[in-house]
Amino acid sequence: EEYRRTTGRDVTASLEGNRILLTSRGLCAHSCTPFNGKNAIVAILMFLDGLGIDGSMGAFLRFFAEKIGMTTDGSLLGMKREDECGRLTFSLSKMDVDEDRLEWVVNIRYPYTYKDQVTADFTAQVAPAGMVMDKVDAHNTYRFPMDHPMIRTLRGVYEELTGKDSTPGHEGGTYAQVVPGIVPFGSIF
């Protein structure tokens, strides 16, 4: 209760037999808007870092707390980027730990103009901590110029009908991998 009150993170520890059970409650958010959520995995990592654990797990926890923490923009890693297509978002989406290894899956949505730089920047940050990027699953970024006739037409019609700003977002990457030429646009995006 003290931890929750002082940090705002909903993490509890309880004893069940000879095991300690950590429970963290978060708030789900899409990986393109992680700042709208509360990452339960990250909250547990920050809790564990506060315990002063030794060894390789302790080194990982310290790295995570210092270089990532509760941020969702890559700023502690020196990777904060933004362009006309949007800003970089960074979210830890999965973690698997056993006696021999720790695997973590990070979802990084990066601005169009920084696509080649992001993987190199992240690799450079994790290497000194003894970590290796085992797999990089990078999708090609996707962009339509704002002055493209289709974009101008869609924006004009949308604004006329709704009275709302129609500036396209940088979401929709999943759709763009499947449907060439799709534009993240309108109230759904």
Where on the chain are the PLM-derived regions?
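Midchain, well-structured core segments that form catalytic/ion-binding scaffolds
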Residues: 1-111
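Short glycine/proline-enriched coil/turn segments at helix->beta-strand junctions
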Residues: 7-9, 17-18, 49-55, 126-131, ...
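Generic structural signal for residues in well-ordered beta-strands
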Residues: 11-13, 22, 131-133, 166-167
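Short proline/glycine- and acidic-rich turn/helix-capping motifs at secondary-structure junctions
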Residues: 17-21, 63, 134-148
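Short, histidine-centered active-site or binding-site loop motifs used for metal coordination
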Residues: 26-28, 136-139, 189
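Serine-centered coil/turn micro-motif
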Residues: 39, 148-149
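Zn-dependent metallopeptidase/amidohydrolase metal-coordination segment
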Residues: 98, 149-189
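Redox- and metal-dependent alpha/beta enzyme cores, enriched for Fe-S-associated oxidoreductases
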Residues: 115-132
